[in-house]
Design a protein with these regions (language model features):
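Beta-strand/loop substructures that line and gate deep hydrophobic ligand-binding cavities in soluble
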Residues: 81-136
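Glycine-rich portal/gate segments that line the openings of hydrophobic small-molecule binding cavities
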Residues: 30, 40-84, 136-152
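Short, surface-exposed coil-to-beta transition loops
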Residues: 5-7, 63-67, 88-93
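A structural signal for short, well-ordered beta-strand segments
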Residues: 8-12, 55, 94, 108-110
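Hydrophobic ligand-binding cavity/cleft-lining segments
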Residues: 1-48, 152
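Short strand-connecting beta-turns/loops that link adjacent beta-strands
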Residues: 15, 46-47, 75, 99-103
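Short loop/turn positions at the edges of beta-strands in beta-sheet-rich folds
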Residues: 12, 33, 72-74, 84-86, ...
């Protein structure tokens, strides 16, 4: 197996600032992102946002741990890079685009190299299932989280 990644987008019925508020609060991600089981902040920036975080994820064949550094370029981009962990490398980002009329396009991208040993476990149907959870499903999860928290 090579890299596990790709990108996926969805349109959210909420203004950019509401979507950014959810994306920016990285420590709540396990509440709404499937397979992401735990996050704990190791460092914060001057605004109190988590910048270095330990994560634990269930990728179906193994639980993987990582230390990730976040970069905030709000309200349109949140990116992260693995500093150390079970995967060889991980980089990802949320990119938000204001569509006007109270709508936002959210694009999730991920580029992860599981490395040789873990890569041997993530093949075929397991690879497809992992990609479905960790890439393709993310924008829909964000949409449900944001739209579900809006007063109706």
């Amino acid at each position: 197996m090579g890299n596990l990644g790709g990108s996926a987008s969805d349109e959210i019925d909420a203004p950019l600032d509401e979507v950014w508020a959810v994306v920016e609060n990285v420590l709540t991600a396990p509440e709404w992102q499937g397979g992401l089981d735990a996050m704990s902040a190791l460092e914060h920036d001057g605004e109190g946002r988590a910048t270095v975080v330990e994560t634990e994820s269930d990728i179906k064949v193994k639980r993987v741990k990582a230390r990730v550094r976040f970069s905030y370029d709000g309200p349109t981009r949140l990116s992260w890079t693995q500093e150390q962990g079970d995967m060889k490398s991980v980089q990802g980002a949320w990119e938000l685009e204001d569509l006007g009329a109270g709508r936002t396009r959210a694009t999730f991208s991920l580029d992860a190299d599981p490395g040789r040993m873990l890569g041997m476990l993530i093949r075929g149907p397991v690879e497809a299932a992992t990609r479905a959870i960790f890439v393709n499903g993310r924008p829909g999860e964000l949409k449900r989280r944001v739209e579900g928290s809006r007063p109706g």
